[in-house]
Amino acid sequence: MNISRSEQRVLHVLAQGGYVRHQRADNGRILDVLCFTRDGHVLADCTLEVFVKLRRKRLIESKASSPYRISDKGRRSVRAQLDNR
């Protein structure tokens, strides 16, 4: 599966324990998304377009109205990255 660089960045943050908060409009559509790292920082690369692509590919999921997290399919498709901690 082809995954863009920005999608890879977001998936990597989610694989490390991050999550995506979303805001819905009155009609139920998602208006805005914020991607948080496990440390509580906001990831600037997480735009609404990237969010929609990840959700369409079923790489992220939300269970019981909770924030979006990485799915099992997303964990299998994310490439390994070095973590400079």
UniProtKB/Swiss-Prot annotation:
Extract the coiled-coil ranges from the record. Answer: none
**Origin, by domain of life?**
Bacteria
Q: Which family does it belong to?
A: Belongs to the UPF0386 family.
UniProt-recorded name of the protein: UPF0386 protein Bind_1628
From the record, give the cysteines joined by S-S bonds. none
Alphabetical list of InterPro entries matching this protein: YjhX_toxin
- The species this protein was found in: Beijerinckia indica subsp. indica (strain ATCC 9039 / DSM 1715 / NCIMB 8712)
Q: Name one Pfam family in it.
A: YjhX_toxin
> Highest lineage ranks of the organism?
Bacteria, Pseudomonadati, Pseudomonadota, Alphaproteobacteria, Hyphomicrobiales
HAMAP family per the record? UPF0386
